């Protein structure tokens, strides 16, 4: 029995180390003690975790039209892809909400025992047409963790390269290591076409960066409890792992699939066979990514099991000149607006003439880089003036013309006194 008179014999909390005189209550267990303060702290932690788990079930899920309208504000064109993504994402999170509400939602009807399967998304289209940006914008609207991974860095377990579990680590990091939050996030895997198997027939030799990666991705796409090394890299038996359930993680996989249009055309009978054989009646414009079928993806090099785990297939199309011009100026965070804000921080108004926007769009089309190349062209055009302006306080505005874009000249710099004279004349 502990003696109460001597400080050395006072009972202490096994967790915080406070003695029984420093706390209101000390509860004894088999060889351990816990004080009332530590019990309160434990209750707070448990309540916070339970609140986080229920968080998604309580938030108001935007309807497909609301998601579509939000995408319209930031992404130019690609209406079919935006519609498909809006519906797929809405159905995915509606499914999670139904699961979190459980039997209360079912209300005793005959659908009680129906379990809704997950619908991951395959996004097909040429580079620079907004595939990644669509996924990023979706995640921002839903306020869920979002991670981007590159399929080309992945290899089968045991070979040099990244394991597929490292993709999940990126999502956990995006959720600030809150696993419950990460389990309801979105993972975007780019360059998925680069892990197609090297030949249409199964190979005898190992294809560690192609078919092997597809096989490794199957389980996490479908839904499994994966063990993720907290520091990334390869697994080894003596390290601790983070356990994450991917059942409610939405996977959006995307790729350019160069050569897929030829496969689609061959299937549809567009191409003739043999020397001098006539071509089919369909023109090249009539068939494209939008006509893709699962059998085309199989011929391209995706394995049947992988295609089966991507039930929603949607496509984006090439961006034409008007679309590129719209991307430059119309969205909420359009490139022109971004650079105008940057110049405004130096007290300068940046002005683009209409023909300058046309010239920038034409250069992007010539380079074949799509929307992704617009920023690079803008940087090239504005670099000289961005170098000079911070050192000059006499400049009120900079005007970019088509000649500046095409020939590499410097934008026209208009001093403050010239602007003041123009205002006085107009007054």
From Swiss-Prot:
PROSITE patterns: CLPX_ZB
Example of a GO cellular component annotation carried by this entry: HslUV protease complex
Classification via SMART domains: AAA, ClpB_D2-small, zf-C4_ClpX
Pfam family, one: zf-C4_ClpX
Chain positions recorded as ATP binding sites: 126-133
Any one Gene Ontology molecular-function term assigned to this protein's record: ATP-dependent protein folding chaperone
Function, in words: ATP-dependent specificity component of the Clp protease. It directs the protease to specific substrates. Can perform chaperone functions in the absence of ClpP.
NCBIfam families found in the cross-reference section: clpX, PRK05342.1
PANTHER family the record matches: ATP-DEPENDENT CLP PROTEASE ATP-BINDING SUBUNIT CLPX-LIKE, MITOCHONDRIAL (PTHR48102:SF7), ATP-DEPENDENT CLP PROTEASE ATP-BINDING SUBUNIT CLPX-LIKE, MITOCHONDRIAL-RELATED (PTHR48102)
The protein, known as: ATP-dependent Clp protease ATP-binding subunit ClpX
């Amino acid at each position: 029995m502990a003696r109460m008179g001597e400080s050395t014999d006072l009972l202490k909390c096994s967790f915080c180390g406070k003695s029984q005189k420093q706390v209101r209550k000390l509860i004894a267990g088999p060889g351990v003690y816990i004080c009332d303060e530590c019990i309160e702290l434990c209750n707070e932690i448990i309540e916070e975790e339970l609140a986080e788990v229920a968080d998604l079930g309580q938030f108001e899920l935007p309807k497909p039209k609301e998601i579509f309208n939000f995408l319209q504000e930031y992404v130019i064109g690609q209406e079919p892809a935006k519609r498909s993504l809006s519906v797929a994402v809405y159905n995915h999170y509606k499914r999670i909400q139904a699961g979190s509400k459980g039997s209360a939602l079912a209300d005793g009807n005959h659908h009680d025992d129906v379990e809704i399967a997950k619908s991951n998304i395959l996004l097909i289209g040429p580079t620079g047409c907004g595939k990644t940006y669509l996924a990023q914008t979706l995640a921002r609207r839903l306020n869920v963790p979002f991670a981007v991974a590159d399929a080309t860095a992945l290899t089968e377990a045991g070979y040099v390269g990244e394991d597929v579990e490292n993709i999940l680590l990126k999502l956990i990091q995006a959720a600030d290591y809150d696993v419950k939050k990460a389990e309801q996030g979105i993972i975007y895997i780019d360059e998925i076409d680069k892990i197609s198997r090297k030949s249409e027939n199964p190979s005898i030799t190992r294809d560690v960066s192609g078919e092997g990666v597809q096989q490794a991705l199957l389980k996490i796409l479908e839904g499994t409890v994966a063990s993720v090394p907290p520091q990334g890299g390869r697994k080894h038996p003596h390290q601790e792992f983070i356990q994450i359930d991917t059942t409610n993680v939405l996977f959006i996989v995307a790729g350019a699939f160069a050569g897929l249009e030829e496969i689609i055309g061959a299937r549809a009978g567009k191409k003739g066979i043999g020397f001098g054989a006539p071509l089919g009646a369909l023109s090249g414009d009539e068939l494209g990514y939008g006509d893709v079928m699962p059998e085309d993806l199989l011929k391209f090099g995706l394995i049947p099991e992988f295609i089966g785990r991507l039930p929603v297939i949607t496509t984006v199309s090439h961006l034409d000149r008007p679309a590129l011009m719209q991307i430059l100026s119309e969205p909420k965070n359009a490139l022109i607006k971004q650079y105008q804000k940057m110049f405004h921080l130096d007290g300068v108004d940046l002005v683009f003439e209409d023909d300058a926007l046309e010239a920038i769009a034409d250069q992007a089309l010539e380079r074949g880089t799509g929307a992704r190349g617009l920023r690079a062209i803008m940087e090239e055009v504005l670099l000289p003036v961005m170098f000079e302006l911070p050192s000059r306080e006499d400049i009120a505005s900079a005007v970019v013309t088509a000649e500046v874009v095409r020939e590499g000249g410097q934008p026209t710099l208009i001093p403050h006194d010239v602007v003041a004279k123009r205002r006085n004349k107009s007054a």
